[in-house]
Amino acid sequence: MRRAIVAFVLLVCCYTLGQQSNPPRQRVEKTPPATTPPAQTPTEQPPQTQEPRTARTPQTEQTPAQTTPQRTPESSEGAEGQQLRAMHFDMAEVPPVITHHSIRVAGRELRYTATAGRMPIKDAEGKIDAEMFYVAYTVDGSDPSSRPLTFSFNGGPGSASIWLHMGAMGPRKVVLQPQGWMPAAPYRLEDNPNTPLDKTDIVMVDAIGTGWSRPADTAAARRFWNMRGDIESFGEFIRMYLTRNERWSSPLYLFGESYGTTRSAGIAGYLADRGISFNGIVLLSTVLSFETLEFAKTNDVPFPLILPTFTWIAGYHHKLPSDLQGDVAKAAQEARDWAQGEYWAALNKGDAMSPQEHANVLDKLSRYTGLSKEIIEWANLRVDVRTFTHYLLADQKLHVGRLDGRYTGPDPNGFMDTPFYDPTSSQTGPPFTSVFNDYVRRELNYKTDMPYWTSAQQSGNFRWSWT
């Protein structure tokens, strides 16, 4: 199931960013079929028992000054000709906050230090153009010359690192309900027994314009809200962190997710030219070729690639035929083999397919996706993410999660065409945001009046350029 989730995150996260910043060719909307597919088995989700726990009181060494954003009335031209509202943020440099904690991982207790702060990113003249928020976790008593150090971030572009931070990498994580649904407030934290902190020190970094990372002004935002500027800002952050924390001799790693994998590739090349090389790079939900993500009339590449993921998710929701449902992993491999051969060849033929070939493809797609033949015919044998998530459980008036296909949310209109939304974001956003804001203030003792932007879109000013 992990491979399915990873693949689905790869596809949909970057499909979203592509639509936002570099939209593909216009798609002609079609009216979906009015009839409903045969009823299927109700959704089931495996239990994942988690117990909440109370927050701990850290040992505090420093407290940062309060940092309040300010805005000015000017405006400036943004990326790709779009208008950016004028903005200005206080770039006063404040010492980071240091607290001490412990956690039990893999049967042994780890004592570690958490450092939260904002790293200045300067221009060629030494002026601070931005500050990047980070939280570093370092195990006490280790030798920096041999202790691995991993820099980790989410993608977007325009996503904060909160999702990896509080869901996978950090020593503390958000408590969700066993079925993965959003729990009722107050939301809780618990120790993360799967944190890689026993293997490597971790630095979680927020991209400029996300989290508490801010550009100095509108001109600085234009400098960083593009691929080149984004890579340069992370490269400079890493150089500064190694310098200020005397970690130049440590084994270095990058851990990026979705667009963060593209960023990782860029950072590796950028820093190699400046004398910094990495021992390894971890790519989660990899996107290094954007053609694999662009669902468009003139691009058939994504459709065979996504099919095994659809099979995994359909199996999770018990939507596969009985002969496939018993072994979903085997079914996904069968779908992969068919997609790379017969399906790909059929798409290449297009209208040259014989009626029998068309019927065979229709049968197989229905078999591997759990969708009705009518829906697949309407989609012209090309099922994209929006079609799949909207129609898989439409007979139950449920919508499947986009970022995580295990999630579902109510869709009262059922088979009627409705605005697209993602139950995953709806159910994880509030717990993650609330818990993180409480965690950094109470356990890490980091104080600020600024809002934490989980997405740069929350700035109301985000314009991304792919140059």
Enumerate the language-model features and the residues they cover.
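Compositionally biased, proline/threonine/alanine/serine-rich low-complexity intrinsically disordered stretches
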Residues: 17-91
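A catalytic-pocket lid/entrance helix-loop region that shapes and gates access to the active site
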Residues: 171-176, 269-373
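Catalytic nucleophile loop
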Residues: 260-265
